[in-house]
């Protein structure tokens, strides 16, 4: 089965082809970073328009690069949510229309389920069950995953997501969008022990809170005034985020008794986070798994793969185009429940 995956939840237009026998046949990705950089963040209307502009050229490029004909596509998977309504609708309408024209099934995929399953595309994929740390611009969650659609929410951010905190602090510091990679780069030049920023809720269950940390950075920047300590600020802020994510992940593993941690989402590409996780998990004889670098950010491959997992169990959507900007993963059903 060859599945076309379409990702348009925010500011990246990603398309990919996944073959159930050969694996990933190819993928293309167009990032709107330059488009939104001058605004310091994503402008939903501009994002939607750019998805419309890029969808067909990217599909043509993907088919050409992969040497696959449209007629060979067996199914279409698109991001149904969560995400920006207009951006989601663009991908959903395109995917549904293409599937209808080809007389093939289509399925809407949960964006974060796609992220969580992306490490399964690696050369050494994790086996279920595992704990998943999902960290992106819109989500920070710890999930226990026992199988496709068998997810238990262990903890989540009660305010800002980790990626959102990175972007907001970067904006305070005058760094360009997107903030996460730029803070990480600047942090390499700084001392993470210079400023003792708070780790909110560190010892309170498995939920996260990053708004207080963001406020603390703002206060410190005002105190410094014209004094340039940006590298130390970046390093200390990043360390506070990483410290919280690592300690909560270790706590989740101990609480569930599981020995495998999957980390996914855009923030999972952060090298300091990876270093700290590998060090901490080695102490408790647990393993950590990541997606390949190209699959950490939003992409079509994770949507194609997640879609295939459900399509092979008999799940598909009807002709009604549905998008769900707010969609908890715990509301997803097991594929077996759908065909029983």
UniProtKB/Swiss-Prot annotation:
InterPro entries with a match to the protein in the record: ATPase_NBD (IPR043129), Gcp-like_dom (IPR000905), KAE1/TsaD (IPR017861), Peptidase_M22_CS (IPR017860), TsaD (IPR022450)
Top-level taxon of origin: Bacteria
Predominant cellular place of this UniProt entry's protein: cytoplasm
Class of the enzyme per the UniProt entry, highest EC level: transferase
Keywords: Acyltransferase, Cytoplasm, Iron, Metal-binding, Transferase, tRNA processing
Reactions mediated catalytically: L-threonylcarbamoyladenylate + adenosine(37) in tRNA = N(6)-L-threonylcarbamoyladenosine(37) in tRNA + AMP + H(+)
Residues the record lists as binding Fe cation: 111, 115, 298
This enzyme's EC code(s): 2.3.1.234
GO function terms (MF aspect): iron ion binding; N(6)-L-threonylcarbamoyladenine synthase activity
Cross-referenced SUPFAM superfamilies: Actin-like ATPase domain
A Pfam family reported for this protein in Swiss-Prot or TrEMBL: TsaD
Cofactor: Fe(2+)
Binding site for substrate: 134-138, 167, 180, 270
PROSITE patterns: GLYCOPROTEASE
CC annotations in GO: cytoplasm
A biological process term (GO) from this entry: tRNA threonylcarbamoyladenosine modification
Localization per record: Cytoplasm
Family: Belongs to the KAE1 / TsaD family.
Its biological purpose: Required for the formation of a threonylcarbamoyl group on adenosine at position 37 (t(6)A37) in tRNAs that read codons beginning with adenine. Is involved in the transfer of the threonylcarbamoyl moiety of threonylcarbamoyl-AMP (TC-AMP) to the N6 group of A37, together with TsaE and TsaB. TsaD likely plays a direct catalytic role in this reaction.
Name under which the protein is recorded: tRNA N6-adenosine threonylcarbamoyltransferase
Organism per entry: Acinetobacter baylyi (strain ATCC 33305 / BD413 / ADP1)
